[in-house]
């Protein structure tokens, strides 16, 4: 749009009038705060904080980073003012303007920058609450116009492990954090910002098998990003190192160990003669050792969550042509025992399909079957079953069950000159078994085959690929592939650190959310090492 001289002059005058009005508003605010300066030292610091917030909001031309830094400084000043006399809830009430104003500065920041700045703000809030709770024995009640609902809205932005720590601050905190309303609010907040969960297994020393859990923001609609490589920060949760007296086997070999994820919990199942299965909370490190499940031959095991009865279930299936019974273990209520169910092999027909997908209803505990033409990987794609496989010479079935070493097998069988395709089949109708089929050509498929695995799909339908191994000497990447737009976005994950002794195995899970009900599971009796 072109502007004439008179139009430009009018626009300038309007902008000047708006700036004068804003300045007048801020002068009025400052005059009002001047009155507060005469009260006491607590009001002095509080007013200084509000003054900084006012100037933070009055800098439209300043960079987002500068505004964020100023707001953080005012928030820190407010926390200092509160530690002298405020109770925990008074501190949260006073901290609310800083948090709300701080959130408003995120409009021009990228997703991963928002997460990094919010983590810093939340950390400051945690320190202020913990310090104020124990630094003063005498509490001075501070009136606040903020309601309890708004306080809960603010505190619902904390991490689950922070909520677990704050429960010991006071009975009032414990009561609020344990209420169904707050748990639902917290879960809703967490579901709106799912993350990628990384389980990194360190096998540098056989006597010290351990697994470290990290998370990073899960990006959505990455095709809108202009950068060829984005950067996301990884947050450390806990180092999981079970009791050495308990026979648990952690291995990167997919032939012997399966690691599953369901609704916030990790399931680790070992082979026939090694270890015992366990369930672990990657946020807190609490875990439960499950009863030993002996099978005559090799067995498969899977993990799922029943959203109706709110129960976790582990499924154990014997080898298809061998003896044994299918068994289910319910976790979350009652005794931890494996119980027999109808075998899945009784209704399988091999006349029409060489491969069959066995579907298990976690609620009804009944099996259904879907035939496929090729051994493939399964993911949840927008609520539908999605099977993925590569059109090349690599046999996934042979890799999983016959190859002695995955890296050695890939070196011998990958064809660097092959023009391979990624095939994606979406099950549109379960009853009729109708599929939608898609094929995508890759220009650097050897790299994907050699170093990456499919982690799953986001809610927006982007398929996430993650590197299978991590070493501190090389960067770690995840890739977001959008099938609808045929775009690929690379994201570097930073923050794993250099503490790992050797090259480590990495398992990546999508759509990880924090649930306070998971932290309250009574059957998670043990606590893993936190170092």
From Swiss-Prot:
Tree of life domain: Eukaryota
Cystine pairings recorded for this chain: none
InterPro entries assigned: F-box-assoc_dom_typ3 (IPR013187), F-box-assoc_interact_dom (IPR017451), F-box-like_dom_sf (IPR036047), F-box_dom (IPR001810)
F-box domain boundaries: 141-188
PANTHER family: BNAA05G37150D PROTEIN-RELATED (PTHR31111), F-BOX ASSOCIATED UBIQUITINATION EFFECTOR FAMILY PROTEIN (PTHR31111:SF130)
Protein name: Putative F-box protein At2g02890
Species annotation: Arabidopsis thaliana (Mouse-ear cress)
């Amino acid at each position: 749009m072109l502007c004439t001289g008179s139009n430009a002059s009018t626009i300038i005058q309007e902008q000047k009038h708006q700036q004068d009005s804003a300045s007048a508003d801020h002068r009025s605010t400052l005059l009002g705060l001047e009155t507060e300066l005469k009260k006491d030292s607590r009001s002095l610091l509080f007013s200084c904080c509000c003054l900084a917030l006012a100037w933070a909001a009055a800098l439209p031309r300043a960079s987002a980073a500068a505004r964020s830094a100023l707001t953080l400084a005012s928030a820190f000043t407010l926390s200092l003012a509160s530690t002298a006399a405020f109770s925990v809830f008074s501190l949260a009430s006073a901290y609310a303007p800083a948090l709300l104003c701080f959130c408003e500065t995120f409009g021009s920041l990228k997703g991963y920058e928002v997460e990094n700045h919010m983590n810093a703000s939340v950390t400051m809030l945690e320190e202020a609450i913990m310090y104020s709770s124990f630094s003063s024995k005498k509490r001075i009640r501070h009136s606040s116009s903020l309601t309890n609902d708004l306080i809960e809205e603010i505190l619902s932005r904390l991490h689950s492990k922070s909520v677990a720590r704050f429960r010991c601050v006071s009975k009032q905190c414990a009561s609020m954090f344990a209420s169904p309303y707050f748990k639902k609010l917290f879960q809703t907040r967490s579901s709106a910002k799912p993350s990628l969960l990384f389980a990194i297994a360190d096998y540098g020393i056989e006597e010290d098998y351990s697994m470290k859990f990290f998370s990073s923001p899960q990006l959505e609609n990455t095709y809108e990003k202009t950068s060829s490589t984005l950067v996301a920060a990884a947050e450390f949760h806990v180092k999981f190192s079970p009791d050495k007296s308990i026979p648990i086997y952690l291995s990167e070999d997919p032939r012997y160990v399966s690691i599953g994820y369901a609704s916030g919990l990790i399931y680790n199942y070992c082979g026939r003669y090694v270890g015992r299965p366990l369930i672990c909370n990657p946020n807190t490190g609490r875990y439960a050792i499950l009863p030993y499940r002996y099978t005559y031959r090799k067995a498969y095991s899977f993990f799922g969550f029943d959203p109706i009865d709110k129960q976790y279930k582990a499924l154990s299936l014997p080898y298809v042509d061998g003896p044994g019974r299918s068994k289910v273990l319910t976790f979350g209520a009652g005794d931890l025992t494996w119980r027999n169910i109808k075998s899945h092999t009784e209704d399988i027909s091999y006349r029409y399909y060489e491969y069959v997908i066995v579907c298990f209803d976690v609620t009804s505990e009944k099996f259904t079957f879907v035939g496929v033409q090729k051994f493939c990987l399964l993911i949840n794609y927008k609520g539908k079953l999605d099977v993925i496989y590569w059109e090349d010479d690599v046999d996934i079935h042979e890799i999983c069950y016959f190859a002695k070493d995955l890296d050695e097998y890939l070196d011998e069988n990958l064809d660097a000159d092959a023009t391979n395709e990624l095939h994606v089949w979406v099950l549109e109708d379960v009853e009729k078994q109708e599929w939608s089929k898609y094929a995508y050509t890759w220009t650097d498929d050897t790299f994907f085959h050699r170093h990456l695995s499919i982690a799953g799909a986001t809610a927006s339908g982007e398929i996430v690929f993650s590197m299978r191994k991590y070493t501190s000497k090389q960067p770690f990447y995840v890739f977001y592939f959008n099938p609808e737009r045929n775009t690929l976005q690379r994201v570097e994950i930073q923050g794993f650190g250099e503490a790992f002794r050797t090259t480590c195995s990495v398992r990546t899970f999508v759509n990880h959310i924090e649930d306070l009900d998971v932290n309250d599971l009574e059957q998670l009796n043990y606590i893993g090492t936190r170092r």
